[in-house]
């Protein structure tokens, strides 16, 4: 494996294992309605969600347009989303290598997914490619340790009582965005 391939496999395997329990953690889904508003949707918009997980964002988007596709690189997340939202469209896709034609979507949406991509720059280039001219890309990320009291406290506790070196594969910097 080269570069961040080990990180990509680690992330994919982790999300495959957590698909059925991810919905129990309502932390990230709380931002979905606010982030969807930022898309400024109209009823005829064609929307792509990346890293859709169990489909909460896709479901919220579907309230404003029926042309929405949720995607995730973890097959079990796609299965979970289809179970929770059987009337919506989901498919497995790699955000870093999308199979869609250029200029296919009016809007692209991704909540807290970018930090799980081994090559976020590739994913953003793919968004640029599949997004129509004048389209909108809305994404969310966690605030940096310096800006987030929660992550600051967590970082301080780990530094004092443990170690950040827990054998995780190298990945892109978590606060690049």
Map each language-model feature to its residues.
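Conserved class I S-adenosyl-L-methionine
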Residues: 1-45, 56-60, 77-80, 84, ...
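Class I SAM-dependent methyltransferase SAM/SAH-binding core
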Residues: 48-98, 122
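A short SAM/SAH-binding and catalytic strip from SAM-dependent methyltransferases
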Residues: 107-120, 143
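Helix-to-beta-strand junctions that scaffold the AdoMet/dcAdoMet cofactor pocket
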Residues: 117-118, 131-133
């Amino acid at each position: 494996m080269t570069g961040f391939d080990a990180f990509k496999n680690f992330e994919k395997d982790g999300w495959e294992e957590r698909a059925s329990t991810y919905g129990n953690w309502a932390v990230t889904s709380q931002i979905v309605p606010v982030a969807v508003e930022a898309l400024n949707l109209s009823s005829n918009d064609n929307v792509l969600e990346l890293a859709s997980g169990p489909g909460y964002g896709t479901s919220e988007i579907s309230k404003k347009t029926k042309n929405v596709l949720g995607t995730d690189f973890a097959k079990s997340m796609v299965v979970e989303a289809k179970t929770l939202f059987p009337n919506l469209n989901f498919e497995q896709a790699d955000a870093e290598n999308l199979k869609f034609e250029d200029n296919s979507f009016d809007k692209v949406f991704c909540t807290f997914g970018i930090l799980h991509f081994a090559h976020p720059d590739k994913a953003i280039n793919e968004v640029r490619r599949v997004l129509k001219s004048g389209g909108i890309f809305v994404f969310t990320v966690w605030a940096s340790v310096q800006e987030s009291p929660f992550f600051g406290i967590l970082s301080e506790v780990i530094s004092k009582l443990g170690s950040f070196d827990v054998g995780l594969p190298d990945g892109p910097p978590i606060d690049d965005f």
